[in-house]
């Protein structure tokens, strides 16, 4: 049975009885994530500027994202499988059968999951399949380098292992619907009353693209307003440049026939033939790469999913004005995404990442291995490492100017409790020690923008920053904690320029304790007054 990679560390391995709730977010700081599910599926597509738990984009009843394996031994018939483990029995329950995307497609029988965040491995085998598969998925995480830890990409390597005695002709095929215009929030309903995200996209198009050492399918939209949060680009690519076939759209047929047409086409020889997609608003992009796996050997095929959604809006957008609603009008609530200033579009993400892929993986693995090899108790390693994932979820983001902000957390469909709340973020330590520049940007906002002339620091920061003091309430623990964090960040960085710039506001913030009727009005160093705090 296939095992975890010897090149990647693994802290935890989950067996078949413990996979249902496993989901490893893949994405950069401030970019959103796609999660690798415990069985190898891609779930929780949270890349469109908001949380979207449970969101798996699909074109109506078919076309949800998946990767599939074609395998034909030299002296046997071809086998087709989703590169996923089996569904649980409960997944087939529903008023009209299973609500799980792609539930009717065959899967591998045996599945395990190994992880040491941000490295996730899915281990798949089946006595009826001549190849075993290991999915190796990650997004770069490199301490002290927020830019290279903030890339909007999911890197998925499919390692095909041949335990048999004859060569196996194989192909891995990835399919992703062009769902630009949908974000998992404003869902329509199909005829059964189930959520239907195919109603958001409009006039979306896919095109085959090539670059230096890669090829793939670029996804864009001509029908979505370029100012909308849901507007952007996607790119599904592979670093394999030979034996690659693709579809820019699936055949537009009735009911399940579009899926059957695709399945039969791939199953014939592991190649795809182009189809006429008709006028589908969300055409499915499919990309297949072929390889021959010698007996007793393995081959790896790497796929990349890049994204670029620039139009993030503030925590609590105001009612749109006539000016911003007019053609070409400015959206006064738009704060943007820093990552989209580094890349022109999703295709440019792929173009920049491919030549650096080896280095990005080496540095990520080096960090994770050093941490896993430490003498900390395993439970501490797991808690500390795995909770770094919060930095890369929609809990956190960077506005177009590079500043770092965070919700208190995420609800399933929206951020929960706005404003980089000082008396919640007080208790978070990872950012300062791993990405000091991001932590210092929070201090700059707190003291440079959210603290007024009296020394009152708004413990929730409104955006854009012209509105930073609007909230107008102070929290004792948050305000005092920010003073301690300013000292900590200076100790870690030695940034005298930052400290000098923020020092006057820091003095005012401390003096605020001593105002009449304040937290420590008598100045004895013990807070007796009314104190808004999180305890």
Where are these regions (language model features)?
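Intrinsically disordered, low-structural-confidence terminal and linker regions
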Residues: 1-8, 214
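Internal mixed beta-strand/loop scaffold within catalytic domains of large alpha/beta enzymes
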Residues: 8-72, 78-85, 92-95, 106, ...
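Substrate-binding groove/exosite segments of carbohydrate-active enzymes
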Residues: 12-57, 267-284, 290, 297-304, ...
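Acidic-aromatic substrate-binding/catalytic surfaces of carbohydrate-active enzymes
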Residues: 29-101, 215-264, 269, 336-340, ...
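Extended, loop-rich substrate-binding clefts of extracytoplasmic carbohydrate-active enzymes
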Residues: 84-153, 251-287
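Short, hydrophobic/aromatic-enriched beta-strand segments in well-ordered soluble domains
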Residues: 124, 135-137, 172-176, 297-309
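A short, structured loop/turn motif at beta-sheet edges
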Residues: 124-130, 161-170, 292-300
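Polysaccharide-binding surfaces and accessory modules of carbohydrate-active proteins
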Residues: 135, 140-265, 287, 312-314, ...
């Amino acid at each position: 049975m296939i095992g975890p990679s010897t090149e990647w560390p693994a802290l935890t391995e989950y067996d078949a009885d413990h996979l249902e709730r496993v989901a490893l977010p893949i994405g950069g700081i401030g970019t959103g994530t796609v999660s690798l599910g415990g069985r190898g599926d891609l779930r929780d597509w949270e890349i469109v500027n908001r949380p979207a738990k449970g969101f798996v984009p699909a074109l109506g009843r078919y076309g949800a994202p998946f990767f599939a394996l074609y395998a034909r031994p030299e002296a046997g018939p071809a086998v087709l499988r989703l590169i996923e483990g089996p569904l649980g029995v409960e997944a087939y329950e529903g008023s009209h059968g299973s609500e799980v995307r792609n539930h009717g497609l065959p899967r591998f029988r045996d599945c395990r999951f190994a992880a040491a965040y941000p490295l996730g491995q899915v281990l798949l085998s089946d006595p009826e399949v001549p190849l075993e598969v290991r999915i190796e998925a990650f997004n770069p995480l490199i301490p002290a380098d927020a830019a290279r830890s903030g890339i909007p990409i999911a890197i998925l390597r499919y390692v095909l292992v041949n335990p048999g005695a004859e060569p196996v002709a194989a192909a891995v095929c990835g399919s992703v619907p062009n769902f630009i215009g949908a974000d998992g929030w404003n869902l329509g309903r199909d005829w059964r009353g189930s959520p239907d995200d195919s109603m958001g996209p409009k006039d979306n198009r896919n095109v085959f693209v090539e670059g230096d050492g890669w090829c793939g399918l670029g996804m864009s939209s001509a029908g979505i307003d370029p100012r909308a949060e849901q507007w952007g680009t996607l790119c599904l690519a592979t670093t394999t440049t030979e034996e690659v076939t693709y579809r820019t759209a699936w055949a537009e047929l009735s009911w399940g026939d579009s899926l059957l047409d695709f399945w039969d086409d791939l199953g014939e020889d592991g190649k795809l033939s182009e189809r006429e997609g008709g006028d589908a608003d969300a055409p499915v992009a499919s990309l297949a790469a072929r390889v021959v796996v010698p007996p007793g050997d393995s081959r790896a095929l790497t796929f990349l999913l890049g994204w670029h959604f620039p139009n993030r809006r503030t925590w609590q957008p105001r009612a749109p004005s006539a000016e911003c609603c007019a053609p070409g009008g400015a959206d006064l609530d738009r704060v943007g995404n820093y990552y989209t200033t580094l890349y022109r579009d999703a295709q440019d993400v792929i173009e920049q990442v491919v030549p650096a892929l080896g280095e990005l993986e080496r540095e990520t693995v080096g960090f994770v291995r050093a941490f896993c090899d430490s003498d900390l108790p395993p439970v501490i390693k797991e808690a500390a490492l795995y909770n770094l994932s919060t930095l890369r979820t929609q809990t956190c983001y960077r506005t177009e100017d590079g500043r770092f902000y965070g919700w208190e957390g995420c609800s399933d469909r929206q951020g929960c409790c706005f404003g980089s709340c000082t008396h919640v973020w007080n208790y978070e330590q990872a950012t300062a020690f791993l990405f000091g520049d991001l932590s210092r940007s929070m201090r700059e906002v707190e003291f440079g923008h959210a603290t007024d002339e009296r020394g009152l620091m708004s413990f929730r920061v409104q955006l854009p920053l012209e509105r930073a003091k609007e909230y107008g309430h102070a929290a004792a623990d948050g305000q005092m904690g920010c003073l301690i964090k300013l000292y900590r960040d200076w100790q870690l960085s030695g940034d005298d320029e930052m400290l000098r710039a923020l020092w006057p506001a820091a003095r005012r913030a401390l003096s605020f304790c001593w105002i009449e009727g304040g937290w420590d009005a008598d100045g004895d160093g013990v807070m007796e007054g009314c104190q808004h705090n999180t305890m």
